[in-house]
Each structure stands twice: as C-alpha cells, then as structure tokens.
C-alpha cells in the first residue's frame, strides 16, 4: 500500500515539539564568593553567560587524585579485577589493581546491552563527569568499552558507604554535612543534578573524607534547564513533588530535589533510622503516602535549635523554600564544623562508627 500523498501545491503543516517552555526555566544557584570552600563556575562550553576564565582547580585531596588519572583506555589490560564490592540496579562494582602503579581503583560495570542512542548518552555523561574534580566527589578516571560493555574506572573508597551509620554528636554530624554540601554545591555549580543522594551513595575513606558517589542516574542540565521528570533514583529519598507530579504545578527543580534527599539522609544519620514513620524497604504505596501526604519529618526537640532549623531548611514541602547547597554551607549549624577542630587525628578516629561494607560478597572474580 502506497502512503497517501498530498495534492501538488498543498503544504501540510508539520507539528513540531516546542524546544523549551519559559515557565519551566529554573534559576541556577548563584556563586557566593564568601564561601569557605571555593566553587568553580560552570564551564564556558556549557553556554553563554558563564565566566570567561576556566574553573579554578580544587586543592586538597583532589589535586592528589589527578595523579592517578593517567590511565589510558588502551591500558585496560593492566587492570586486575578483584572482589566485588557493590552492586545495584545500574551495575556491579569491583575492586581492581592497576598493575604498573599498584594503585587500587573501583571498576563499575554498567548492566545491559543499550541501544546506540542510549550508549551515546551514557558515554556523554561519563565524559562530562571525568572533568569533575572536587575533594568531596568520587573521581571518575576513565571509561572503557569492552565488547559492548561500558565500564567506568572510579576512585576507590576503602571504608565503603555510610549506610547504617549513626552519628548522634552534632559537631561530628556538622562536619559530615559540610563535606557533602561542599561536593553537592560544586556539582550544582556545574549544572549536574545527582538525583539519588542517599546514605549508600555517600562513601568514606580511611582519612575520613566523605565523597558523593554513583552518578548512574545523574543528569547533566543544559542552559535551557529542561525539567527532570524521569522517575530515577530511590523512592525513599525522593522529594514529594518528584513522586507526585501534581505538586508544584508539575515543575521539578533537580537542585531542590537533591537538597530534600540530603536532608532525609542527614536526619537518618542523626536518628539512626529512616526518619519517616514507615520502613524505607516498605511497599511503594506506604512510602509515597508518607512522603507526599504527611508533614516533613523534623529533628527531635532534644536537638539544638541550629540543627532543627538546618533540617527544616532542607525538608520544606515547597521546593522554592528549600535553601540551596551554597546557602546551607553558610548555615550556623554547618559553620560550627570548624576544620581546625574536626580534622585532628583524635576527632577523625571518632567521626563515624565503622560503616557497613558495600557488599557482603568477597569471592574473587576474574
């Protein structure tokens, strides 16, 4: 059967999808030069309106991390795969050794035989994340394509995740929160929304440096600020407007969504349990009702006014009322975490209890 053709000289209008909606344009977090932690501006290649200079490099452990990033894709054979240290919906993570340098890394093997368009998007996001360089963000060193399987070489965090950690001392919790906020503010300044902030995606090493990890569901935002409406991430830590799209007129601010997830995680550290009146492993209906219908959880009355206010700034039902990561870095609760006090060896040893390992599996693989 031949397709129906329009008569000569008659043009048929073709409907085109609108490229952007002005009402969905969201403000970017503004750079605050008074921050104790310098945050580089978004790269100029992302569009107009950025700084003409290049982003300043971060100091501290980030500079030392750069010395490990000289592994080329052609040297994949130099990696010796060891134990599996974690697994999730996006893939499996293995501990590997780079034989020429004897350095340890984490190798994430991404699941699935993806279509070409999906593979290009994954590779594009990984390439952008390779340029991320901050002391509180897990470094992405290299990407490999092995027989159609995408594998990502990451910084190795030897103490695992903070899932199950109970940090009831506010001074220590303030230092923990400051590190996470520092990394989150840096990511947001580069138009990167994580979308899955939770304790199991916050890693710690033997130096007690806390870093944000697992960008398997992160999204790079263009200058047009396309809305992030896809349901990725862990529902227990999702913001109300992300679960129920009828809230907030259907608009989703990815930055504010990360702040909600951060607030739930920090309150969970303080309480030693999931802060909502349901189990985070419960059924979806119970979780959604608790998050969308009930009042946001609060810090207990026994906590300090500063901490109670900090949690309130994160867990506002209306996204526009939540503070940005850069604003929260100036909150009185965070400012009490003086690096000169919290970075002494004695306090570092007591900062957190030994976290649970990423995985109970210890069988070596090849």
UniProtKB/Swiss-Prot annotation:
Q: Which GO terms describe its biological process?
A: defense response to other organism; floral organ abscission; inflorescence development; plant-type hypersensitive response; pollen-pistil interaction
User: Which family is this protein grouped under?
Assistant: Belongs to the protein kinase superfamily. STE Ser/Thr protein kinase family. MAP kinase kinase subfamily.
- What does the function comment of this entry state? Involved in the second phase of hydrogen peroxide generation during hypersensitive response-like cell death. Involved in the innate immune MAP kinase signaling cascade (MEKK1, MKK4/MKK5 and MPK3/MPK6) downstream of bacterial flagellin receptor FLS2. Activates by phosphorylation the downstream MPK3 and MPK6. YDA-MKK4/MKK5-MPK3/MPK6 module regulates stomatal cell fate before the guard mother cell (GMC) is specified. This MAPK cascade also functions downstream of the ER receptor in regulating coordinated local cell proliferation, which shapes the morphology of plant organs.
The protein in question is named: Mitogen-activated protein kinase kinase 4
Enzyme superclass (EC) = transferase
Look up keyword Protein biosynthesis and say if it applies. no
User: Tell me, what controls this protein's activity?
Assistant: Activated through serine and threonine phosphorylation by MEKK1. Inhibited through phosphorylation by GSK3/Shaggy-like kinase ASKs.
Residues recorded as bearing Phosphoserine in the entry: 6, 230
Biased composition, class Low complexity, residue ranges: 53-69
Please provide, alphabetically and separated by semicolons, the GO molecular function terms listed in this UniProt record: ATP binding; MAP kinase kinase activity; protein serine kinase activity; protein serine/threonine kinase activity; protein tyrosine kinase activity
Query: PTMs?
Result: Phosphorylation at Thr-224 and Ser-230 by MAP kinase kinase kinases positively regulates kinase activity. Phosphorylation at Ser-230 and Thr-234 by GSK3/Shaggy-like kinase ASKs negatively regulates kinase activity. Phosphorylated by MAPKKK5.
Question: What did gene disruption experiments reveal?
Answer: RNAi double mutants MKK4 and MKK5 have a strong abscission defect. Higher sensitivity to high salt and drought stresses.
Taxonomy of origin reads: Eukaryota, Viridiplantae, Streptophyta, Embryophyta, Tracheophyta
